Amino acid sequence: MSLRICVGGATGWTGKALVAGIVAAPDLSLSGAVARKAAGQDAGIVAGLDVLGIGVAASVEQALSAEPTDVYIDYTHPSAVKANVLKALEMGVPAVVGTSGLAAAEYEEIAKFAEKQGLGVVASGNFSITASLLTRFSLLAAQHVADYEIIDYAKSTKPDVPSGTARELAERMGAIQKSVPGYPIKDIIGPHEARGADVGGGRVHAVRLPSYVLAVEAIFGKDGERLTIRHDAGTSAGPYVAGTLLAARRVVALKGLVRGLDNLLFGTLPA
């Protein structure tokens, strides 16, 4: 039997590509779609496909009540994702979270509720396989180099700062060891904002300009040497679809929260 998936944010860039990817996969089927502004329309038409006979719902509760669903995937908006995922878990459906912008405290709340429900959640700021390698390499580097900063690049219209990729990376690197500025931020002469934001114990700088899709750069420095690890995303949603659907296939066997596609692929990094 195919894995039945409901997509939240079905009218978005990744959401449309996910609908197409699910329809094309022999082991998956689309059970529902959520997009408030497109409610009532056919999910296939919204995604640029032929008619699928599946209506777009206005809410997660409406979509999951309409058809049996094995996995809920969320690519909605930072303001909606936590409530969406908690609702899915409440209704007995594990979740995959690709929406960026959640804070560490929100992930903690989701993790606790997932454990309580005995269900799995996989959340990643970036579901690209190569981005997960950036994360893993950077976490390994953070174990050995205490001085680091992150630069986050995205299009000028991206609403959340930093991106989910950069935020997740900074928080996870900070959990290994925090990067203490060589000169105290409070004593800086000039605008303190020029040194970036403190995210998870490290400095993060966000660049928002036309021509960028998404790029993240982790820079590590020691006396006399420097290491730069960088990932650049292209204009195709394909890499995110592949990683998201990989997570959807695996989340049904999990309990609790797995944060970061790298942990799903390579296992938890030893302390």
Regions found by a protein language model. Name each.
Residues 8, 75-76, 98-99, 124, ...:
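Structural motif
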Residues 6-8, 13-66, 146-271:
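C-terminal substrate-binding/catalytic lobe of Rossmann-fold NAD(P)-dependent oxidoreductases
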Residues 31, 57, 96, 120-122:
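Structural detector of well-ordered beta-strand residues that form the stable sheet scaffold
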Residues 61-62, 67-90, 102-106:
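Beta-loop-alpha module in the N-terminal Rossmann-like domain of NAD(P)-dependent dehydrogenases
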